[in-house]
Amino acid sequence: MKVIFLKDVKGKGKKGEIKNVPDGYANNFLLKQGLAAEANNSNMKTLEAQKRKEEKEAAAELENAKKLKETLEKLTVELKAKSGEGGRLFGSITSKQIVDELQKTHKIKLDKRKFEMEDAIRSLGYTNVTVKLHPQVTATVKVHVSEQ
């Protein structure tokens, strides 16, 4: 019997796949548990419509990430911190502080985990910080740390 998997089934198929499985397995397990649906014309059309919808959403998400990248690369995030001799900071500037400043001054909401910083910023001046907005889109934000 041909079935469309509605959920991932270990060793049998992934969500959205169409596979031929034994009739008994399909009727007694997959269909009863709601893990699969019979692959008839109406279910096939539903699956195609769902795939098209997911592709549109993915394209829209990518487009939004590209727009956000353009916006972020034009900005400079201004932060103030106390520093000692030679421009070394007392403490450090973390991705959380950068996110808070972006939210406060530019109304841009980002997740602090999207910032790719090896270490926190520990000196005065300009620093470029990369932000992973989407698996295919990476932006660079300029952060300026000045004396408080």
Curated annotation (Swiss-Prot):
Gene: rplI
Domain of life (superkingdom): Bacteria
The species this protein was found in: Bacillus cytotoxicus (strain DSM 22905 / CIP 110041 / 391-98 / NVH 391-98)
GO molecular function: rRNA binding; structural constituent of ribosome
Gene3D superfamilies recorded: Ribosomal protein L9, C-terminal domain (3.10.430.100), Ribosomal protein L9, N-terminal domain (3.40.5.10)
Entry-linked HAMAP family: Ribosomal_bL9 (MF_00503)
GO BP, sorted A to Z: translation
NCBIfam families: L9
Name this protein carries in UniProt: Large ribosomal subunit protein bL9
